A protein has these predicted regions:
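Terminal amphipathic alpha-helical/low-complexity segments used for targeting or macromolecular assembly
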Residues: 1-26, 32, 185-202
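Short, charged N-terminal helix-start/capping segments
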Residues: 3-8, 15, 25, 29-35, ...
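Generic preference for hydrophobic/aromatic residues in regular secondary structure cores
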Residues: 6, 12, 18-21, 39, ...
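Short Cys/His-rich Zn2+-coordinating modules
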Residues: 14, 54, 72, 102-103
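ABC ATPase A-loop
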Residues: 28, 49, 157
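Glycine-rich phosphate/diphosphate-binding loop of Rossmann-like nucleotide-binding domains
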Residues: 37-39, 44-71, 76-77, 82, ...
Length: 202
């Protein structure tokens, strides 16, 4: 879960002396969490909560509002903005306006934005998603037999236990179901049913 008792969290933890904390009264670090040297925690736009045993590694940037779940790791040099990260996740690269549920990994460089990622998902190195159309029109997402108008910014919805290969390109407003194994060159289809395999969804 996402720490149901976050406001009961023992927030007496601190960051390394070389870190920069902006609006530090809105930065809540668990006593058992570690915020490593050179990291920046910017709570100008919302609170930042670093939960029990989480690690924000060297030189990472976290802009609030943000929640880093129990036992999760934010990799060195990562850039996170407006995120909710569940427990036991490993997150690197650039992530914004996105939820990662527990036990999901995006360890390497690549951009994921305006997206919703289930549990036990693994995104291979340099997996990227688009979240804005070139003509700035609203994004439509197919869910089952219906299409939903998701507004100007919408990335991807990825179901539990799905994996992507290295350098996977995910189009604007893409739906990927449960238990998929996605790989191959070029943009993936915008609707990938559960248990699909490969670039052609076979």
């Amino acid at each position: 879960g996402f720490g149901e008792d976050i406001y009961d969290l023992d927030c007496k933890g601190s960051a390394h002396e070389s870190c920069i904390l902006i609006n530090n009264d809105r930065v809540h670090i668990s006593n058992s969490a570690v915020v490593s040297a050179g990291s920046i925690l910017d709570a100008t736009d919302g609170d930042i909560i670093i939960d029990d045993n989480a690690l924000v590694d060297i030189g990472a940037l976290v802009k609030g509002p943000a929640y880093i779940g129990k036992n999760s790791i934010v990799n060195p040099g990562a850039k996170l903005k407006d995120v909710a990260i569940g427990p036991f996740c490993k997150i690197g690269g650039e992530v914004e306006h996105t939820t990662f549920h527990g036990f999901s990994n995006k360890q390497h460089d690549g951009y994921i934005g305006n997206s919703y990622i289930g549990e036990w998902v693994n995104l291979g190195a340099n997996t990227n998603n688009s979240d804005l159309k070139n003509n700035y029109s609203n994004v439509r997402i197919r869910i089952g037999d219906n299409e939903v108008d998701a507004g100007m910014f919408a990335g991807c919805l990825i179901g539990d236990f799905t994996k992507t290969g290295i350098s996977t390109m995910i189009n604007t407003g893409t739906y990927i179901g449960l238990g998929c194994n996605i790989f191959g060159g070029g943009f993936q289809k915008k609707y990938i049913p559960s248990f699909s395999w490969g670039a052609d969804g076979e």
